[in-house]
């Protein structure tokens, strides 16, 4: 927005003039509101108070017509000269609507030639300047426009229209001018107030013409309309309606009425006509009668009359020869008639024939007799019949019969059941000779390729439909010492393939063997195939006895001659001296249970370990004494279950007892707060066997301070301060005295070599230099 203009007069003189103008305008406004008198010219008005744009428009619409709508440069100059200066300027009737500057009173978009913006305007600062002000008496841009936010407060510049409801007699457009208005008359009107209507004048009516008129604005004046019609028997020659135009001229000349004329008639062929005319030939009220020659009949009325509409009461009749009923070509055939192929008159003869594949049923020629009847009924064309299909070919048939069952162009398709295939054509058609186009097909069973007997085996088959045909099943077996590799059964499928490849017979194998625990295995089959005839020998380590056969053989059935043996302690022979393991004891906080076979902790002794609640076993839960006189693992231990470390923050104080290690099962911790604070939570917690503390960590919170405690704290603080000063003085004196007696020795180390607070080393053995 442009800055306010500089003062031209002294500020005192400006203030006096401004207040006087304000008072005068306000007085005029009050007088107009009280009298509510009509004015006869376009006048301008403004508010004495500033308002927002919306409120300013409401003010103008309430007391006047609307915010001012500027029409030309002269109006701008007039406003700038007449309206007093106001530092915030005036709102006018332009606003941005749908992003276009629009005159709000007429809803018309501001055109480029009507723009009167100040330099660099509109600039739309902050994207919200949607309303327009006018710089009245601005030194830098008088009468120019500027866009401003609609919420700013400015004076409302209003206008009161000169045009009223009855201006220009409601027959013209009232055009506002400064202090007056002019009338632009609508077409058909004239005069200063458009009070006169243009006239077209009357006209003489021709003979036999009747007229009916309407005169909304005066006799034979603008918008008068006249319609015309004629007496019966006469037709209108010219326009049916006339209208008086805005130019004072009728739309056309008046019409005339002429006598109605019917079309001329002629005698029908093979007949005659006789007419009576009242005036001219074939005019209104003329009549004509008709008759036919012998052998013909009249089709139509015997007499016709010319009507007032200029048409005959009926079409002209004709004389028609006696004819037989119409014939049509038979379906799938043709017809040839003479002498007339369409009229079917007396003595007309028609012959018939059929298309290929069809035969004629009925007379091939008929004739129209003098009785009007044909000598025989019309024939029909029937499709040729083919032989019926046999029912013994085992095929499924699906047929279509366009002209009847198994007749010409009948088509049949053949399919076979699962496991069989069609031999012959899959589709047959009935030809125009009455024969099928191919022999009847048949279904034959699907066959699979013959299966060979497996080497070293046998094959057994069941074939219900013949050799190796669909639904055949074969079973396979192997000779002794051989096992079947592949399917035991094969079936012939509908596709002509077996359900799998033929199997083979391979040499039988026995299950794989392994050495017994604390023993060995010796087999001649180095590749571990364990085929029929393989022999394996077993043995045990020293001090053990073989239980079972010491050798086994693989038989033709694929089984060993005996189960694999095992190695056990020899209870008959005395064990080797000293064959025992070191003695074991139960772990601390744990248990031990042993099973001794020969002696305590002897060979094969097994010991099981466990821990008490709150402890976890670290190591193997079971140990066994081996022949090497060593246990299978190191003896396990029991370790206490750990709880999470408790976080201690000031000012809370914690004391813990840890019988099995810091923060372990059985650890208990107690809590207390300094004097003057309260414990929020449990004062004791314990580490449980599940590794969780029994309660959550408590906290300290400030408690109420009594007068006695306050005095105690103040007194203690004072005493502490005094003691600190006294101690400092004494310490300074003591250090000064000791420096005088220093013999070169180092002072005692106040920290124990054990790292324990409050325990000091002997000065005689202090290693410090």
UniProtKB/Swiss-Prot annotation:
Main function: Ca(2+)-dependent receptor for myeloid cells that binds to carbohydrates on neutrophils and monocytes. Mediates the interaction of activated endothelial cells or platelets with leukocytes. The ligand recognized is sialyl-Lewis X. Mediates rapid rolling of leukocyte rolling over vascular surfaces during the initial steps in inflammation through interaction with SELPLG. Mediates cell-cell interactions and cell adhesion via the interaction with integrin alpha-IIb/beta3 (ITGA2B:ITGB3) and integrin alpha-V/beta-3 (ITGAV:ITGB3).
Underlying gene: SELP
Give the domain note. The C-type lectin domain is required for binding to integrins. Binding to soluble integrins alpha-V/beta-3 (ITGAV:ITGB3) and alpha-IIb/beta3 (ITGA2B:ITGB) is cation-dependent. Binds to the allosteric site (site 2) of integrins and activates them. The interaction with integrins may mediate cell-cell interactions and cell adhesion.
State the protein's name. P-selectin
Specify where the region named Disordered lies, as residue ranges: 740-769
Its placement in the membrane is given as: Single-pass type I membrane protein
Organism of derivation: Ovis aries
Binding partners and assembly = Interacts with SNX17. Interacts with SELPLG/PSGL1 and PODXL2 and mediates neutrophil adhesion and leukocyte rolling. This interaction requires the sialyl-Lewis X epitope of SELPLG and PODXL2, and specific tyrosine sulfation on SELPLG. Interacts (via C-type lectin domain) with alpha-IIb/beta3 integrin ITGA2B:ITGB3 and alpha-V/beta-3 integrin ITGAV:ITGB3. Interacts with alpha5/beta1 integrin ITGA5:ITGB1 and alpha4/beta1 integrin ITGA4:ITGB.
Chain ranges sitting on the Extracellular side read 33-717
Q: Where is this region: Interaction with SNX17?
A: 760-769
Sequence ranges assigned to domain C-type lectin in this UniProt record: 58-158
- Where does this polypeptide localize? Cell membrane
Listed disulfide bonds for this chain?
A: 60-158, 131-150, 163-174, 168-183, 185-194, 200-244, 230-257, 262-306, 292-319, 324-368, 354-381, 386-430, 416-443, 448-492, 478-505, 510-554, 540-567, 581-625, 611-638, 643-687, 673-700
Q: What does UniProt list as this organism's lineage?
A: Eukaryota, Metazoa, Chordata, Craniata, Vertebrata
Name the UniProt key words of this record, in alphabetical order. Calcium, Cell adhesion, Cell membrane, Disulfide bond, EGF-like domain, Glycoprotein, Lectin, Membrane, Metal-binding, Repeat, Signal, Sushi, Transmembrane, Transmembrane helix
